[in-house]
C-alpha cells in the first residue's frame, strides 16, 4: 500500500485553472464516495479550498493510483487529461505525509501560518469518516495532521497577528485609501472568507459595512456582529453605486457582478473610484470590470505581493514548525512500521497454533482414553509452550520494525519462518477490515507482501 497526493494549488496552477478544479463544500461527500469506487483507491480524502484542490489517497499501486485519480478529476470537472495534467502536483509516500502536515500547519499556504486551512482539513477528515471513505491508515494520519496543526499554533508564534487572504485584501485597501474610517465597505458573501474580511475590517475602524448574501438572514447575522447593514442580493446594483470598497467571496459558480451591472451602478457614482477585491474561487467578479473607468479590480492572485510583505517574520518562525513536523513524521512512520508488523506476528502465531493443533489431534488419536479434563490441561500447556517460544521472536520483530532497513529485515524474518504467504493473507485482512464498505475486489491484487509504505 502507498500514500499518494494528487492536486493543484496556487503554486502549480493559475486561478483560471483552480476555479475549474474546485469542489463546492456540498460536493465533497459525493466526490469522496464516488472516488472510493475507482480501481486502486483504498482510502481517500479530498481537501478543496480557494488555493488548492488535493486528493489524498491510499492506493495499492502508485502508477494505477495516479492514473485513476487523474481520470476522476478530469471526468468530474469535464476537462481533458491534456488540459489538466500540466498543472497537477504529485507527492508519494514520505513526501505525501510531509506535505499533509505542512498543509495542516499552514506552511504550504499562500499566507504562511494561516489557521483557516487547519479547519478545512479537519472538516474534510470528518466528512471522510462519516462517508466511510477512509480506514486504518488515514484515520491515524489525519489525526496526527490535525494534532500537529494545533500544536503549531499553540507552541509557536506563527499565528500571531493572524493573516489570511481576506486580511491581505484589507491591507491592500489600506495601501490605496489610507484611513478606512470614512469608507463604505460592501462585503459580498457571508461565508467564512466574508466573515474573516469583516473581522479584519472591523479591526481597522471602518466607517460603514454592508453585507449582501443569497440568504438574507445569514447576511443579517454577519452584519449585526459588526453594527453593519444587511441587504438582499437583488439590491446589489444599488449597493455597488454607494460603496467605496467591495470584497467578494460568494463561491458562486458564475459571475455575480457583471460588466453591465457595474456600468449601471457607475452612472450613479459620479466618477468616484471603486476598489474591488475578488477572493472567491471560482471568481465572483467579471474580469471585464477592469475595463471600466474608476474600477480597480484585484483577484486572489494579485494579493501575493501583500501576502509576501507580511510573511518575513513568519518564515523565521516556520523553522520551529518544521521541527514539529519532523517529529510527527517520525511518529507516523513508527506507527506505520508497527502496522506492518501486525500481519507478520499474526502469521507467526497462526503457524505456531496450527502446529499445536495438529499435535493435539495426534495426541488424542494415540491416547483415545484421555478425559476431557486431561485434554484441556494438555491443550493449555502446549499453548503455553507455544507462547513462550514465540515471545522472543515477537519482541525481536517489533524491534526490526523500527530499523531503517526494516522492510528487508522483515522479509528475511518471514523467509526464515516460512510465513510469507500467511503474512500476505493477514495483510489482505487488515486492508479489508480498514475498508469496511470498500469492495477490495475492485483493486488489483499485488503479489507478495510489503509490510511498509514504500520509501
From Swiss-Prot:
NADP(+) binds at residues 189-194. Catalyzes the NADPH-dependent reduction of glutamyl-tRNA(Glu) to glutamate 1-semialdehyde (GSA). The active site is at 50 (nucleophile). The record marks 99 as: Important for activity. The lineage of its organism: Bacteria, Bacillati, Bacillota, Bacilli, Bacillales. This is Glutamyl-tRNA reductase. It catalyses: (S)-4-amino-5-oxopentanoate + tRNA(Glu) + NADP(+) = L-glutamyl-tRNA(Glu) + NADPH + H(+). Keywords: NADP, Oxidoreductase, Porphyrin biosynthesis. During catalysis, the active site Cys acts as a nucleophile attacking the alpha-carbonyl group of tRNA-bound glutamate with the formation of a thioester intermediate between enzyme and glutamate, and the concomitant release of tRNA(Glu). The thioester intermediate is finally reduced by direct hydride transfer from NADPH, to form the product GSA. Belongs to the glutamyl-tRNA reductase family. One of its GO terms (molecular function) is NADP binding. Homodimer. Possesses an unusual extended V-shaped dimeric structure with each monomer consisting of three distinct domains arranged along a curved 'spinal' alpha-helix. The N-terminal catalytic domain specifically recognizes the glutamate moiety of the substrate. The second domain is the NADPH-binding domain, and the third C-terminal domain is responsible for dimerization. Its EC number is 1.2.1.70. Substrate binds at residues 49-52, 109, 114-116, 120. Pfam families: GlutR_dimer, GlutR_N, Shikimate_DH. It comes from the Bacteria. One of its GO terms (biological process) is protoporphyrinogen IX biosynthetic process. HAMAP family: Glu_tRNA_reductase. SUPFAM superfamilies: Glutamyl tRNA-reductase catalytic, N-terminal domain, Glutamyl tRNA-reductase dimerization domain, NAD(P)-binding Rossmann-fold domains. Changing residue 105 to Y: Loss of activity. The keyword NADP applies. InterPro entries: 4pyrrol_synth_GluRdtase, 4pyrrol_synth_GluRdtase_dimer, 4pyrrol_synth_GluRdtase_N, GluRdtase_CS, GluRdtase_dimer_dom_sf, GluRdtase_N_sf, NAD(P)-bd_dom_sf, Shikm_DH/Glu-tRNA_Rdtase. Pathway: Porphyrin-containing compound metabolism; protoporphyrin-IX biosynthesis; 5-aminolevulinate from L-glutamyl-tRNA(Glu): step 1/2.
